């Protein structure tokens, strides 16, 4: 018994093997949809990775700046000759000036023993000035808030009464900003 061959209505023998144009177009549409959804997922993944990377970078920068500020601030008032060096000269919400006698000669050298940390209005750069000009410490600073405490722990604005400084830094771009805080107690005060 011979296999039956299919014929179209005009009597022409129809092909039974291969793909038609419709099959090819359907496969192309399905493949394109899969590619588009894959591209969308890759794009979302890239955005999430960039956001996380920016946040980690902001956190590392903020920690570095905070550690540097607090470490230097703890040295404020260092006066081995007991010459009466005032530890804090300026105590403002976004500017702090302090000094220490690192070489022990009884005189504060303004080019290396007097330090200013500041965030200028309208800028997003935390700067440190130790006599050589205000050099950038970190960028993308959204906020620097300095608050000062006296011996009893009460807030003060008098530089002569400062015994501790609370430092709050907000660093990073909108949506990935990081806030770090610490309190540095001045170790070299005469009670």
What are these regions (language model features)?
Residues 89-154:
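Type IV pilin-like appendage domain
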Residues 2-8, 47, 57, 102, ...:
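Short linear sequence signals and composition-biased patches located at protein termini or domain-edge surfaces
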Residues 82, 109-113, 178:
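Residues that act as N-cap/strand-start positions at coil-to-secondary-structure junctions
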Residues 2-4, 17-78:
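Aliphatic-rich helix starts adjacent to a transmembrane/signal segment
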Residues 50, 57, 73-100:
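Short, glycine/small-hydrophobic-rich surface segments
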Residues 64-86, 135-152:
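Generic detector of solvent-exposed, compositionally biased contiguous segments
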């Amino acid at each position: 018994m011979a296999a039956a061959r299919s014929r179209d209505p005009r009597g022409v023998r129809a092909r039974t093997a291969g793909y038609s144009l419709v099959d090819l177009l359907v496969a192309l549409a399905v493949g394109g949809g899969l590619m588009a959804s894959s591209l969308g997922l890759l794009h979302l993944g890239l955005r999430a990775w960039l956001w996380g990377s920016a946040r980690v970078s902001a956190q590392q920068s903020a920690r570095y700046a905070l550690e540097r500020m607090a470490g230097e601030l703890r040295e404020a008032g260092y006066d081995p000759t007991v010459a009466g060096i005032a530890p804090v000269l300026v105590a403002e919400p976004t500017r702090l000036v302090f000094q220490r006698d690192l070489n022990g000669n009884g005189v504060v050298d303004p080019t290396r023993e007097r330090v200013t940390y500041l965030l200028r209005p309208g800028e997003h750069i935390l700067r440190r000035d130790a006599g050589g000009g205000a050099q950038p410490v970190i960028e993308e600073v959204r906020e620097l808030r300095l608050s000062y405490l006296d011996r009893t722990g009460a807030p003060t604005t008098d530089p002569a009464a400062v015994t501790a400084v609370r430092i709050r830094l907000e660093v990073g771009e909108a949506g990935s900003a990081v806030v770090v805080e610490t309190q540095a107690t001045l170790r070299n005060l005469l009670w």
